[in-house]
């Protein structure tokens, strides 16, 4: 019993970091879309159904920036700026409005 307790204590002492590590701040946004798993693909899309499926989606040819936001790039083509989870064959799946830059 004492050996088990001693081994558990030794394991915890070895596993504990010597110094507290610093977490560097990171930007969670990469352009008009979040950097998560969902809604991370910038798309210019046409009409949509219930915010789940959008038609006529295409990846913009230009890189968006604060000077030239995705909304402006898509509006020039008559489309809406969206952030989609998946873009396949002109369809945008699980899309939300793009964030302002």
From Swiss-Prot:
Keyword tRNA processing: no
Signal peptide annotation: 1-15
Cited InterPro entries: Cerato-ulmin_hydrophobin, Hydrophobin_sf
Compartments (UniProt record): Secreted; Secreted, Cell wall
Disulfide cross-links: 33-83, 44-74, 45-57, 84-95
Principal place of residence: secreted
Gene3D superfamilies: Hydrophobin (3.20.120.10)
Inducing or repressing factors: Expression is highly up-regulated in the presence of root and stem powder of Shanxin poplar, but also under carbon or nitrogen starvation.
Disulfide bond in keyword set: yes
Cellular compartments per GO CC: extracellular region
Keywords: Cell wall, Disulfide bond, Secreted, Signal
Entries under Pfam families matching the protein: Hydrophobin_2
Family: Belongs to the cerato-ulmin hydrophobin family.
Function: Aerial growth, conidiation, and dispersal of filamentous fungi in the environment rely upon a capability of their secreting small amphipathic proteins called hydrophobins (HPBs) with low sequence identity. Class I can self-assemble into an outermost layer of rodlet bundles on aerial cell surfaces, conferring cellular hydrophobicity that supports fungal growth, development and dispersal; whereas Class II form highly ordered films at water-air interfaces through intermolecular interactions but contribute nothing to the rodlet structure.
Assembly description: Homodimer. Homodimers further self-assemble to form highly ordered films at water-air interfaces through intermolecular interactions.
PANTHER family: HYDROPHOBIN (PTHR42341:SF1)
Descriptive protein name: Class II hydrophobin 5
Organism: Trichoderma asperellum (strain ATCC 204424 / CBS 433.97 / NBRC 101777)
């Amino acid at each position: 019993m004492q050996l088990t307790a001693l081994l558990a204590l030794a394991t915890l002492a070895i596993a504990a970091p010597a110094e507290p590590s610093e977490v560097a701040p990171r930007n969670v946004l990469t352009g008009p879309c979040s950097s998560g798993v969902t809604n991370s693909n910038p798309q210019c899309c046409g009409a949509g159904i219930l915010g789940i499926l959008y038609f006529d989606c295409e990846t913009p040819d230009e890189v968006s920036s604060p000077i030239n936001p995705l909304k402006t790039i898509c509006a020039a083509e008559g489309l809406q700026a969206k952030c989609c989870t998946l873009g396949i064959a002109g369809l945008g799946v699980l899309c939300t409005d793009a964030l302002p830059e």
